[in-house]
C-alpha cells in the first residue's frame, strides 16, 4: 500500500488469487518478507503447495514481487519447473526429488530473505533436501543481474541461524553453533568464513550498526539474554561489550550451578559433546542423583541455551547433576 500525507491508499495483495500464506504457518514472522532498498520490489517466503504435497513437503521458495508490473518471480526454481513425483508411503531420503541433480533447484526449506544494501543481491537461509526438517541451513546468495546462486557458508559445517549483510554488500555476519556454543562468524561472496566471537555462550539475533559494529543478544546456561555490541576485528576475533544488565540484580541473589564440558566416546567410536550442570554448592566428596536431559526432535543442538521451559539451572537446583548430550 502507498502511504501519503493524506493517508494509506488501497493496498495490493501480492498473493491475490493464490491459496497460500506469507508468512508461512505456524512459526513464520515478518522476517519472511523484505523490501528492496529502492522500495520497488518485495522478496518473500512461500510454500506454494496444496493438499498432500503441502502436508509432506518442506519445499518453500523465495519469490520476488515487482510493485510496478505486479509480476512475481521464483528465485529458487526456473519458470515452468515441475518437481518429480513423491511416494508418500516411502522415506524422502532416496526419492528422485532429493537426487543430487535436483539440489540446484533448492528443493528444501528456503526462508528469511534479505536484500543487500546496494540492492544487487538477495540472500536467504536454504536447506538442500525436501522433507528433511533438520537439514543444515546454508546461506544462499542470488545475483539479481545474472541469476546465479552461490552458497557462501559451505566451509562452515553447521547451521546458519541468523544473519545480516555488511554495509559493503560483499560480506555477511551470521550466527552458528559449533561444539555446543553459538558464536558470530563472518563470510564473503567467495565463501571465506572467519569466526568473530568465542566462548561458552549463544548469540541470538544480530543487526548491523554504523561503523561496522553489530548489535546482538547473548545468553548461556547461567545467564539469560542481554544485549551486546560486537566490534569485528581485522584479526578475525572481535571486541564484545555488554550494554544491558537487566537481570543482574536477580542473578546476584542466586546460587547457580557451574557448567562443565565433557567429551564422551560413543559406541561407534566418535567423540560426543556433553554439557554437565552441577548443583549449587556442589561437593565433589558427596554423591548426587543424575538427571539425563534428552533432546527432542532433533531439530536443534544442545547448545548454551537459556530456556524458560527446560532450564538446566532449575533442574540442578533440585540437587541433580544434569547431563545434557
For the regions a protein language model found, what residue spans apply to each?
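A flexible loop/linker signature enriched in serine peptidases of the S9 family
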Residues: 1, 15-29, 45-63, 74-111, ...
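Short loop/turn segments that connect beta-strands within beta-propeller blades
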Residues: 3-7, 66-70, 143-147, 187-192, ...
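A structural motif specific to WD40 beta-propellers
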Residues: 11-12, 73, 150, 194, ...
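Residue-level detector of Asp-centered blade-edge/turn motifs that repeat once per structural unit
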Residues: 37-38, 117-118, 167-168, 209-211
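Hydrophobic beta-strand positions that form the internal "hydrophobic ladder"
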Residues: 42-43, 119-122, 171-172, 196, ...
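Conserved blade-ending motifs and adjacent loop-strand segments that build the rim/top face
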Residues: 152-162, 194-206, 244-255
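Serine-hydrolase catalytic core recognition
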Residues: 204-325
Amino acid at each position: 500500500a502507498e502511504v501519503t500525507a493524506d493517508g494509506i491508499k488501497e493496498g495490493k495483495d501480492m498473493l491475490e488469487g493464490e491459496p497460500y500464506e506469507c508468512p508461512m504457518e505456524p512459526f513464520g514472522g515478518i522476517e519472511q518478507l523484505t523490501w528492496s532498498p529502492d522500495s520497488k520490489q518485495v522478496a518473500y517466503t512461500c510454500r506454494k503447495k496444496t493438499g498432500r504435497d503441502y502436508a509432506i513437503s518442506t519445499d518453500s521458495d523465495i519469490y520476488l514481487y515487482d510493485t510496478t508490473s505486479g509480476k512475481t518471480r521464483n528465485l529458487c526454481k526456473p519458470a515452468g519447473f515441475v518437481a518429480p513425483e513423491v511416494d508418500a508411503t516411502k522415506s524422502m531420503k532416496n526419492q528422485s526429488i532429493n537426487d543430487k541433480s535436483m539440489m540446484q533447484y533448492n528443493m528444501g526449506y528456503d526462508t528469511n530473505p534479505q536484500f543487500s544494501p546496494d540492492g544487487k543481491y538477495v540472500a536467504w537461509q536454504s536447506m538442500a533436501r525436501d522433507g528433511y526438517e533438520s537439514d543444515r541451513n546454508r546461506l544462499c546468495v542470488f545475483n539479481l543481474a545474472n541469476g546465479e546462486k552461490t552458497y557462501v557458508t559451505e566451509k562452515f559445517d553447521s547451521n546458519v541461524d541468523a544473519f545480516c549483510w555488511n554495509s559493503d554488500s560483499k560480506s555477511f555476519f551470521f550466527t552458528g553453533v559449533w561444539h555446543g556454543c553459538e558464536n558470530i562468524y563472518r563470510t564473503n561472496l567467495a565463501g571465506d568464513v572467519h569466526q568473530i566471537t568465542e566462548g561458552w555462550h549463544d548469540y541470538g539475533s544480530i543487526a548491523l550498526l554504523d561503523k561496522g559494529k553489530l548489535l546482538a543478544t547473548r545468553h548461556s546456561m547461567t545467564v539469560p539474554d542481554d544485549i551486546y555490541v560486537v566490534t569485528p576485528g581485522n584479526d578475525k576475533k572481535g571486541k564484545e561489550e555488554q550494554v544491558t544488565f537487566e537481570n543482574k540484580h536477580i542473578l546476584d541473589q542466586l546460587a547457580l550451578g557451574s557448567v562443565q564440558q565433557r567429551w564422551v566416546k560413543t559406541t561407534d567410536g566418535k567423540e560426543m559433546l556433553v554439557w554437565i550442570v552441577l548443583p549449587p554448592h556442589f561437593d565433589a566428596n558427596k554423591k548426587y542423583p543424575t538427571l539425563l536431559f534428552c533432546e527432542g526432535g532433533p531439530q536443534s543442538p544442545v547448545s548454551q541455551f537459556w530456556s524458560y521451559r527446560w532450564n538446566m539451572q532449575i533442574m540442578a537446583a533440585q540437587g541433580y547433576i544434569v547431563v545434557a548430550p
